[in-house]
């Protein structure tokens, strides 16, 4: 490696410190150094394309955290590595291991948990699974990137103990235990300093204290300086072309502001990452990205969806006996297609299955009736891809030059490809010398409405755009007004009404061309709304009343939960709450399915026959849900976050200094009292507590024994079918030199228990179970003294409390 560094010119070295494109690092052909490619995860691997090429859509981070199953998460990591290889990707930008401070945060669904121990256990397995597959993880966002409000500028004001004891724990575990190969710095500041310019965090903690030898990558456009960032330890500015590193760094070296040895160290780390991920090896894939639909990976995705679903309430209704169900009403806006979160984690799935379809197959002898009931869109929703011909396919034709690619023009496209999403984005060069500011796109498909009447169609675009049906202009956005779409470079939504006939196929065409060659970004989002129907709410209630059982599928979607903005509150969008109440009034035999990425208010939960929290379960979610409803599988998830009764009940309360922040600063004054640690310490009951989740079995904790630091639990299933237990072990400090939470998760074991065979699980508590961060010694201390070990089924459902004496351990 030193030999290669010695052969590089200063310009070549510095070229390896910045992206060349949105997703790639430049190659150095004369030395055989190929380009490194990164891609968004963490819930799928999109590849370099942002125009709708298909990838397997995995369950979101909250669902993964809900599995409480590190072995399964390792398999998930392997499946993600396979997806990455199919796209020629060397680095997955994930997982997200930020701790959930407030459930209002827009990217809560990407995180694993509010608890640092659980997050760390899941993260370690995830990273090991991916990297054992020869693909790097870039764990993110380092550090305290816990809200979207002012995320590009906010300063997280956090004390040393809280930082180390809560927010850095998952990163530390990923480095020390999993050997993660890359870390992404966060957009925000910590205590007034940009995360990418924090020498104490990057060189001091990450590399010095933890021994990290990998690459430190900026979040996209999250670099703010040359000397400060380079000196702090940032290795790679993304995306390209660079603004602060790359050639600007070379100038800083030549002018004596940065020592060349600093650049050499960055290059060595880049070359090490390339070596670890096989860049340029015989097995390294070429640039072609495949849309592989692998059955093995799909099976893993379904298992994660199943084990990540939490049975919150069950009044004996689930599982349903298919033979006893003659009619079922499937109701709700997410019953037609389960939603996923928005932002950089979103991918275009291979499969679009509805809950109504999947349940209809499992309840083959029953009459299934679907009614939407209400809508949850924030403005117009993306056009329903099931109404687009060719299995939801557009043809994108590319034209050289910035002119409008009108239908019937003499110009011929130089290239064409199929895309599969209603939102398409081109960034940077389509090919060498042809940037997104210098070519145009014509997008075509057939559109077959499923309802007759007055539809609303619309466009948002980065660039100029026109929408045609059968050649006639329906929406004209050729003179766009600047809006918030496409990272603030796009237009406001332009929409119009058109009368359409159900079952008739229309030729749909979108013409998209640049507004300015100086903006290397071109994008379009096609939206549509069906004719308004004032009777859909009443019809949904009526079919529920007339059916043996009702399944109401509600939740959120990527318009409400997304990178870029937080949620305004914890309520279900639109009239969904009223719909649930009305259906429960009509039929108490109602299963409520919540398809959302973070906690929601559920004032109706105690009236429901059953409540399932599926999170965003990915493209296998509908079939996984149907299997669970009829008992072919069990929802074995447990909550990785607390569900408050109201948003202001949580640790950040209603104090705007703690959230969303005041004058560019957000205070972390809650300290170590995050999530359940807060609720248990102050004695407040959440709506659903951390670790909660029911089973289809009837499992009792028959014996609990704690000898020294070894915990042993015997479980007996008194039900008539196999059930799953997640034994949770908490520690309470009785003699602590610092204030501690009432209880802290220190271990867990997930196990299936058969009715005829008791199971015994064991867990050994090590020094980490008793530790706290000692500010005076700048390290962890496991203080000697009296403790209690709490063993239970959740943070509040404690089955045994056993006192023990811990002899202590030196600072480490």
Residue ranges and their predicted role:
Residues 803-811:
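Short beta-strand edge segments in extracellular beta-sheet folds
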